[in-house]
Amino acid sequence: MLASQYAQSMKQKNFFLLPNSVFELNLNKYEFYIYAYLIRIEDRRTYQCIVSYPTIAEAVGFAVNTVAKYVRTLEERGLIRTERTEFVTKDGRKRNGCLRYHILPFRQALDRHRERQLAELELATARQRAKAK
């Protein structure tokens, strides 16, 4: 019974996967919700999605400014990369479009996080040694 329910869910694509190690990154709730939403709507073949701040804000229940702030922190952490898009109106003028989000390989972000933690630990150890002298 359970296997058939799983197979049915797979056909409906009513779910998405997040790596378990996402919890190692110590994302705050804003970063987590936004990252999870971007994973949910990404094109699984290209690892990209195009969505506006207001759309994300409505989906996760945060203010637009909060979404913009934490999208930047997700970029700094190496989880996503954003790219501006443009479109041409009917009268021929170029306008800014929504951001295109590139979901970056999770392993790289996790490795970067661990390297940062190791560097902080080494710095703290060096400070303790200097204090002891």
Language model features: what each stretch is:
Residues A132-K133:
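Short acidic DE-rich linear segments
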Residues M1-N65, R72, K94:
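Short recognition helix of helix-turn-helix/winged-helix DNA-binding domains
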Residues N65-Q128:
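Winged-helix/helix-turn-helix nucleic-acid-interaction surface
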